[in-house]
Regions:
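Carbohydrate-associated surface elements
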Residues: 161, 181
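N-terminal subdomain of nucleotide-sugar transferases
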Residues: 1-51
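Short hydrophobic beta-strand element within catalytic cores of glycosyltransferases
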Residues: 297-300
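Aromatic "clamp/platform" in nucleotide-sugar-dependent glycosyltransferases that forms part
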Residues: 280-281
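Conserved donor-binding/catalytic core segment of Leloir-type glycosyltransferases
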Residues: 4, 156, 191-207, 211-216, ...
Length: 366
């Protein structure tokens, strides 16, 4: 199939600031497109110009960057708007068999739904209303715009919480979710682990890393003071976390490692007993399936919308966790075995094929 993927926002900005990156090849959506290519589909990926990398790249498929307009109102970090993208879809729609667009609350999904609804999938992640402007724009979109203008497109949710949310506003929704996939070529796995846990996160307030440090310190005091905690990531709270670690006299147990590329991250994840999450606010967290395919269980609260997948398949612990849960994972290898057993079902090519099968079943029923 000839597939157009509409995904203007390639990575998550912080405080409406889009960071400059050297490459987009390590993003979730780029690797998802690779999964479609591995299933012998011809891919074109449409991206907002603000997310264009600083260095020239050669891509595995066609990648087009579109200029954003009305940027003072439609922030490219939140909801990009592009006249050029609308024109491109209108002009080129006949050259594609399928259009896959990210999010119901987005202009690219609105464009595709208006111009070619019969060949449009909206791959939807949000499970709650966006908080901007006291949720008013989000509520207007989901209650008025989506039911009128996006009702003919077919929505495939990325999680069960996303399904339960979007089903309130649209009827043409798949009950079967398709989660974020992982490029298994970038992530190996192993059963044997070191005595260490890992955090992979931006060091920003909503990620609540300080809480993880304190819980890990309680684990050191109560169970095993030889364990290590590796914190991978960068952000505004780096210095504050560094001071906290010193106050706890835990410099020999807790390390702030900064940014790591996929190859480096793979080694650290693969060697760790568990990935730790205690976030205040998140949707689908890509770090969760990345950890699982490394054979590394996840300990998280219930906030991430893909946390249900961990609980259902016994891939870790999902609750308001504490040091006792760290001990449970550290001493129970069955969680690691479950992660290894389910690894293949989280691959990009597996999940892309799953999405196409859902689509084919849908159009055969029409």
């Amino acid at each position: 199939m000839r597939i157009l993927v509409l995904n203007p926002i390639m990575y998550t900005p912080h405080k409406n600031i889009i960071p400059k990156v050297k490459s987009i090849k390590d993003t979730m959506m780029y690797n998802m497109c690779l999964g479609f290519k591995q299933n012998n589909h011809e891919i074109t990926l449409a991206v907002a110009e603000e997310y264009k990398p600083t260095e020239k790249e050669t891509y595995d498929f066609k990648v087009l960057f579109f200029k954003s307009n009305l940027t003072s109102i439609c922030l490219p970090s939140v909801i990009p708007f592009s006249f050029d993208l609308y024109t491109y879809i209108k002009k080129e729609q006949s050259n594609f068999d399928l259009i896959i667009s990210s999010e119901v609350f987005s202009f690219q999904s609105l464009f595709a739904s208006l111009l070619c609804p019969s060949k449009t999938i909206i791959w939807h992640e949000m499970a709650i209303h966006q908080r901007k402007m006291k949720k008013l724009p989000s509520k207007i979109w989901y209650n008025i715009i989506a039911p009128i203008f996006e009702k003919k497109a077919y929505v495939i949710p990325r999680s069960r919480p996303a399904y339960l949310f979007i089903k309130k506003y649209l009827k043409n929704v798949s009950p079967i979710p398709v989660e974020h996939g992982i490029n298994l070529e970038q992530f190996t796995f192993q059963k044997e682990k070191k005595d260490q846990f890992i955090v992979v996160s931006q060091l920003i307030p909503r990620k609540n890393i300080e809480s993880i440090v304190l819980k890990f310190n309680s684990f050191l005091q109560k169970y095993n003071n030889n364990y290590k905690l590796l914190i991978v990531g960068k952000g505004e709270l780096y210095n504050k976390l560094e001071r906290l670690i010193k106050e706890l006299n835990a410099e020999s147990n807790i390390s702030l490692l900064g940014f790591k590329n996929h190859a480096e991250l793979n080694i650290l994840l693969t060697e760790s007993k568990a990935l730790l999450i205690d976030t205040f606010q998140d949707n689908n967290m890509v770090s969760i399936p990345e950890s699982i395919v490394c054979g590394t269980p996840v300990i998280t609260n219930t906030i991430p919308t893909n946390s249900y997948f961990i609980q259902e398949n016994k891939l870790g612990i999902v609750k308001e966790w504490n040091e006792d849960d760290l001990q449970e994972i550290a001493t129970n290898i069955s969680y690691t075995e479950n992660c290894i057993n389910i690894r293949e079902t989280l691959s990009n090519d597996y999940l892309c094929n799953k999405m196409i099968n859902i689509w084919n079943n849908h159009i055969h029923k029409i």
